[in-house]
């Protein structure tokens, strides 16, 4: 259950929309390596940034399930921590629970004041939270709530709303094409990801309430493009009359669209997405994807930085929270900052570029005529 504080939530969204050792040596920043903000020597840096008052560690999950973690979240987190005057260590577990645990241990040893994590699964996430809390370190779950983990705070988007946007977006796109009934299917995120459960809750309810379409397939794509593509092949073989798919993110949508191209049905069977990646936005412009959910991660990153600095300064972080999310495993409400997602169609792709979360150069490569048509620049 999500409980919201309306005024503070509206303010946050309005502002946002306007605006270690061996493992670290394994790659550059863009490849998942660590980043550390330079320390200040005085009360402010030469650029006017506040003095570094503490250290924050961030563990990102991977770079395969979505490119957003490296192309959006990392730079936005770096910028938010720098603006807050916080030293930061940002690492990527690259899908490995063992690496996740090692990074957690390293950050605790490094003496971080706050640990921010996006779990790979509940077990590895909880293990890290337990170790951090035993060391007296506050923990913020970032984007995904670790069920049963006991994090102190949670920063994300309204994930049921994300799913509702996907379901309604598919319905609207199909009806705009004159398709008022037919068979559709779901390709969900990983079963171990609480967000995937919330997304499905949103789109399943919208599809049910509309009543126009029949769900004939419902499987996980495990946040993997290849797996999602294979699931589509199964659905299409059993139901060649499919008219649409709720596909939970842009990465999986890309895998599905690749298989659709092989079958010659790209654009005939519409899919949905999430994360507003360059690939996803290009697929939207080409008519392969009904739309994508834009989650402005600069809002999410700033909220995480605001919580971290409040914790470090001994202030009350709950005053920053916009509401709470229930951890059903523990039966407790976790103070949370939840931002509002936005549905993006071909007509609004430029909004993502304007927000600085994707570049026209990346989106428009090879489809310059479509970008010109829809004003993407």
Model-based region annotation:
Residues 2-9, 13-14, 25-377:
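A residue-level marker of the well-folded mature domains of exported/periplasmic proteins
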Residues 20-23:
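Bacterial Sec-type N-terminal signal peptides, specifically the leucine/valine-rich hydrophobic h-region
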């Amino acid at each position: 259950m999500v409980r919201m504080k309306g005024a503070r939530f509206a303010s946050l969204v309005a502002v946002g929309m306007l605006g270690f050792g061996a493992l670290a040596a394994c790659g550059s920043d863009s490849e998942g390596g660590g980043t550390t903000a330079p320390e200040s020597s005085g009360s402010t840096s030469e650029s006017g940034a506040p003095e570094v008052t503490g250290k924050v560690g961030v563990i990102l999950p991977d770079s395969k399930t979505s490119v957003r973690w490296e192309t959006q979240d990392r730079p936005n987190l770096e910028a938010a921590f720098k603006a807050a005057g916080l030293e930061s260590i940002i690492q990527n577990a690259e899908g490995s629970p063992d690496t996740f645990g090692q990074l957690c241990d390293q950050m605790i040893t490094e003496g971080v004041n706050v640990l921010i994590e996006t779990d790979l699964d509940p077990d590895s996430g909880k293990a890290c939270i337990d170790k951090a809390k035993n060391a007296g370190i506050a923990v913020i779950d970032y984007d995904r709530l670790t069920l049963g983990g006991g994090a102190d705070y949670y920063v994300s988007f309204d994930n049921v709303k994300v799913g509702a946007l996907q379901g309604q977006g598919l319905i609207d796109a199909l009806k705009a094409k004159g398709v008022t009934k037919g068979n559709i299917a779901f390709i969900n995120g990983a079963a171990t990801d609480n967000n995937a459960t919330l997304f499905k809750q949103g789109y399943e309810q919208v599809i049910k309430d509309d009543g126009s379409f029949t769900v004939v397939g419902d499987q996980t794509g495990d946040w993997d493009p290849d797996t999602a593509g294979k699931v589509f092949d199964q659905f299409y073989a059993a139901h060649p009359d499919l008219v649409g798919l709720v596909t939970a993110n842009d990465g999986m949508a890309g895998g599905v669209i690749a298989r659709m191209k092989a079958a010659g049905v790209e654009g005939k069977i519409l899919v949905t997405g999430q994360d507003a990646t360059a690939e996803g936005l290009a697929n939207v412009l080409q008519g392969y994807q009904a739309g994508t959910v834009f989650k402005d991660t600069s809002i999410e990153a700033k909220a995480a930085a605001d919580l971290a600095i409040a914790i470090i300064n001994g202030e009350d972080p709950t005053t920053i929270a916009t509401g709470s999310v229930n951890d059903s495993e523990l039966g407790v409400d976790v103070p949370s900052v939840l931002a509002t997602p936005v549905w993006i169609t071909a007509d609004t792709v430029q909004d993502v570029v304007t927000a600085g979360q994707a570049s026209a150069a990346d989106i428009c490569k090879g489809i310059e005529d479509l970008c010109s048509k829809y004003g993407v620049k």
